[in-house]
Amino acid sequence: MSLQAFRIGLLSTTAAPLAYARPFSSYAALLAKKKGKTSGKPGKADNEEPIEIIDVKKYVIDATKQFEKTLELHKRKLAEQKVGTASPTIFNDLRVGKEGQKFTELAATSLKGRNALIVTVFDPKDTKNIVSAIMAAGLNLNPERIPNNDQQLKVSLPPITTETRQAVCKDLKKVFEDYKHSALKESLGHVRGEIMKELKHLQKKNDDVKKVIQDVEKIHKEYTIKLQEQLKQAEKSVMNQ
């Protein structure tokens, strides 16, 4: 065999394996290429692990989407709380009778002016149980039968005073705290914590990961401010009623 043919054969048998990118499911770890023990021959590695390539910018996109969802839920909850007992949906979560039927399956509620709710019971035989469910709900509301009508109840609402406005504002603040930082999975703090937990599995010395952590923190602060603005607007609306 010629010297040139021998060299070509040697090169073809000692080429190092290529690194490859494996698909990344939700939040896999960002791994560096690790070298194992070598066989002693130059250019040969026996135990090299492949590189997993992750677009860490997805964390920022995901954080923004989840924070935006939290903002929408917070705004909706504030609106519900702001109405207080005057909301036609106030009884929707009640369970009625021994069988625990949903209130909305047995009756519908509408607002009459600013000081009363009208409950229309679909079947007269359920009226008594509807009354019991409302009185047992701890809402301090007393439904009364409308004369000559077995299917409608009138629920008088307490007058709006400075004290009631302040009480509503206190409830609004509680909603804000829940969506700012709590065990609630939609809270800004919980969302941030879950994302940071995933980021800890990535390379801490990686510059891209560091940048993502900084970006997520920045976005979290921005949405906390937006949440505070929603609270201020809701409180202002209540106190100016």
UniProtKB/Swiss-Prot annotation:
Pfam families: RRF. GO terms for molecular function: ribosomal large subunit binding. One of its GO terms (cellular component) is mitochondrion. Its main location: mitochondrion. Keywords: Mitochondrion, Protein biosynthesis, Transit peptide. It is found in: Mitochondrion. The keyword Zinc-finger does not apply. One of its GO terms (biological process) is translation. Belongs to the RRF family. Necessary for protein synthesis in mitochondria. Functions as a ribosome recycling factor in mitochondria. This is Ribosome-recycling factor, mitochondrial. The lineage of its organism: Eukaryota, Fungi, Dikarya, Ascomycota, Saccharomycotina. The gene is RRF1.
